Amino acid sequence: MGQPTTTSLFMRDVMFHRMTGTSQAVNDVATLSGERREIIRRALNKKILVPNILELMPAWPSEFQPNIDEVNVEIDEWLKTVNVAKEKKLKHRARGNYTLLAGIYYPHCRKEKMLALSQFLYWIFFWDDEIDTGGELTEDREGTILCCAETNKCINDCLGPEPNYTPPPGSRGTVEMLYPILRDLRAGLSPVSTMRLKQELHDYVNGVKNQQKVRQEDHLPNPWDHFQMRVDDVGVIPSITQNEYAMDFTLPDWIRRHEAMEEIVLQCTKLTILLNEILSLQKEFRVSQLENLCLLFMNTYDMSIEQSIHKVLGLLKDHYKICIEAEARLPWSTTDEKLNNNIREYIRGCQRLATGTACWSYNCERYFKLSQLNDQQELLLDLSRT
């Protein structure tokens, strides 16, 4: 498929229909500010066909780790021991299959490393959903601050200079489960990579705390401010560092801090955010989580939802091009091929952050039903409230 244009996006409105059986959604809308209600009204019941996002990143293939099913057996046993509500565990296991996500992020890692990598992804989705729209802490500012403080303490305990892997008595389940996960990850990381992971996790946790505050405000944020906030705190950056754990190597810090590598990490982060804003739009819209670029461009620039999605797709193409161009500026060695291989592996890990998130979304029902995909992997987004 070629690059999408406005006309190549199949878009159609459907008639406004009665929301019988969706009284919860109606009640949710009634409590929102006028600005938020207006965005819902304008997007409600639209159906938009979105092109296969993987085709917008053609140089980056998707691969699958061969032991996903075997690791899932181990995950199912591990989940029984996790102090999280059974309903939440069942929901995430059925819809998310985060072992699949780990298997796409790290397709060439050894099977024994897959367990900790999969457990980390289960943790990040469990933890994030507590604070995200519809979670236990969505409206609880003090509870969110406390949860983030406990989580930051866990990160310091496990990844700091004097590691302590014992959770404090009374820790919430999503903090308690993180201690052994970080213990296992640290065992396979160099000191410099451990310090990077520590800072990246702090940035993520503090960013989620900031996002929760933004969602409580009456006015929707500017889309560019929202995009920058997501770049600053997005939880995918720790998954790049974990590629060093997965593939048994350490990237020297001077290479990680090289401007071209920083650019690649930044652009792959932006790509992951952009594609996720599109692929998660339906799910977020249905629970009135309106801090989504597709809806924020609508609000700020008086665009239709179709125009807004097209704009996000255009940004995705732009950032992909910037990322490709940055590879030519990397500090390749003329004598150390092992170092060059490690650089290549790190770059592939960055790229798989974007392609892996999209590929996983097309192979589970975290954000939409698989029946909404056609044979060309085009997605028919359904912005109804049912």
Swiss-Prot record:
Q: Which reaction does it catalyse?
A: (2E,6E)-farnesyl diphosphate + H2O = trichobrasilenol + diphosphate; (2E,6E)-farnesyl diphosphate = alpha-humulene + diphosphate; (2E,6E)-farnesyl diphosphate = (-)-(E)-beta-caryophyllene + diphosphate; (2E,6E)-farnesyl diphosphate = (E)-2-epi-beta-caryophyllene + diphosphate
The GO terms describing molecular function are: (-)-E-beta-caryophyllene synthase activity; alpha-humulene synthase activity; metal ion binding
This protein's UniProt keywords: Lyase, Magnesium, Metal-binding
Record pathway: Sesquiterpene biosynthesis
List the GO biological process terms.
isoprenoid biosynthetic process
Tell me which residues bind Mg(2+) 2. Answer: D128
- Please name the top-level EC class of this enzyme: lyase
Residues the entry annotates as binding Mg(2+) 1: D128
Enzyme Commission number(s) of this protein: 4.2.3.-, 4.2.3.104, 4.2.3.137, 4.2.3.157
User: Motif location (D(D/E)XX(D/E) motif)?
Assistant: 128-132
Q: Which SUPFAM superfamilies match?
A: Terpenoid synthases
Q: Which residues does Mg(2+) 3 bind?
A: N276, S280
Q: Where is this motif: WxxxxxRY motif?
A: 360-367
The residue numbers the entry assigns to motif NSE motif are: 276-284
| KO phenotype (gene knockout) | Abolishes the production of koraiol.
Q: Cofactor(s) for this protein?
A: Mg(2+)
Where is the signal peptide, in residue numbers?
A: none
What does the Swiss-Prot or TrEMBL cofactor note state? Binds 3 Mg(2+) ions per monomer.
Binding-site list for (2E,6E)-farnesyl diphosphate = R366, Y367
Which is a Pfam family this sequence falls into?
Terpene_syn_C_2
Family, as annotated:
Belongs to the terpene synthase family.
| Role summary | Terpene cyclase that is able to convert FPP into a mixture of sesquiterpene hydrocarbons and alcohols. The main product is trichobrasilenol. Additionally, side products include alpha-humulene, caryophyllene, 2-epi-caryophyllene, african-3-ene, african-1-ene, isoafricanol and pristinol. Does not accept GPP, GGPP, and GFPP as substrates.
Query: Subunit comment for this entry?
Result: Homodimer.
Q: What is this protein called?
A: Terpene cyclase 6
Q: Which organism is it from?
A: Hypocrea atroviridis
